[in-house]
Design a protein with these regions (language model features):
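Conserved short alpha-helical segments that host acidic/polar catalytic motifs at enzyme active sites
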Residues: 1-202
Length: 205
């Protein structure tokens, strides 16, 4: 399992993002990650959190992860968020879920001209990279997310961070939650709502 959190703000999103992700720490014990977009473009950090909590691993990265929009995750599986450059532009992506027809989708990607995927231990492909490959088969992020949800058998909720904003897509059967919160000058999207309700000034949309 895992959880994700995203923030779009008129001012710095970094601390809200940091604490929002940290509130999901009970959902995963292997990897944590943050990606932000600011004046310098995209910045990202991923750490192993098997032997120490998210907060202590990422506290030292916060000065470098400065921006007004960001996404991040706690993951029990793959390292993420990923940074991607495609015909849609540069973006960051993080996911929560399971792809049951992974082998079929990978085979189709090769047949359609997708050159390669980065292989992980024991021959696994990062599921988030596969989702990005599906999105990139279409001509817009909206169409790409709809296409990915249509093709994936299983359950997959997705956050995509672009220079223009954050796209959030709940898995099409509603098995996993995606909730939206707000405070003055900022919106957030979260796997679990207490991640923003526990932060002062935030409420449901």
């Amino acid at each position: 399992m895992g959880g994700f959190f995203g923030v779009a703000s008129r001012t710095s999103c970094t601390l809200d993002l940091f604490f929002g992700i940290d509130y999901h720490s009970h959902l995963g014990t292997r990897r944590g990650g943050m990606a932000v977009y600011g004046d310098g473009g995209f910045r990202r950090a991923i750490h192993n959190i098997e032997n120490s909590p998210f907060r202590t691993k990422f506290d030292r990265d916060l000065d470098e992860l400065e921006g007004t929009m960001g996404i991040g995750c706690i993951s029990d599986m793959d390292p993420q968020p990923l940074l991607v450059r495609s015909h849609l532009g540069s973006y960051a992506i993080t996911t929560v879920g399971v792809i049951r027809n992974e082998d079929e989708l990978i085979k189709e990607a090769y047949e359609n001209g997708h050159v390669h995927f980065m292989e992980q231990s024991i021959g696994r492909i990062n599921a988030t990279e596969l989702v990005a490959a599906l999105i990139d088969q279409q001509e817009s992020f909206k169409d790409g997310l709809l296409y990915a949800q249509k093709r994936i058998e299983g359950s997959m909720s997705i956050l995509v961070l672009t220079k223009d904003g954050i796209y959030a897509a709940r898995d099409r059967r509603g098995r996993t939650p995606v909730t939206i919160g707000k405070k003055e000058g900022a919106f957030c999207v979260s796997f679990e709502n207490f991640a923003y309700l526990n932060q002062i000034g935030r409420a449901h949309v």
